[in-house]
Amino acid sequence: LGDTFRWKGENVSTTEVENILLMHPHIAEAVVYGVEINNTNGRAGMAAITPAESLATLDFGELLRWAKEQMPAYAVPLFLRVKVKMETTGTFKYQKVRLRDEAFDPRKAGDDPIYAWLPGSDTYVQVTEDVLADIHGGKFRY
């Protein structure tokens, strides 16, 4: 059935979230995995996505509203990593472990922009080093 992770006391199926994200007209590929946030229990959802057209076509507020309508709040990815092309292994599997290890740190993501759904916000915002420091420093309550 695929990988799962726990967030907010719930089991989240990465395959289910991936399949839902792939129904969005502006998402061509999606890989979902759990990442750790300091001072929280479990793993928060993160999705590496490839836009169907370009990054400019993604409306992050609309994407978040849509995701919240399609799945329970605990399953909605808190972080997005936007990739031009998804890397695969020699057997055409997505490199989920590497993505999980790089998490939502923009310094580890190369040219891939990373976005976060911050508590109280109604859209995803780009993760800068300042936003990353605020997340790790506990400014936001997840």
Task: Describe the function of each predicted region.
Residues 1-75, 90-94, 98:
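AMP-binding/adenylate-forming catalytic core of the ANL superfamily
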Residues 71-93, 113-137:
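AMP-binding/adenylate-forming catalytic domain of the ANL superfamily
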Residues 81, 100-101:
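Nucleotide phosphate-binding site architecture
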Residues 102-115:
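A short, polar/charged loop-to-alpha-helix boundary motif
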Residues 105-108, 132, 139:
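Flexible coil/turn and secondary-structure edge motifs
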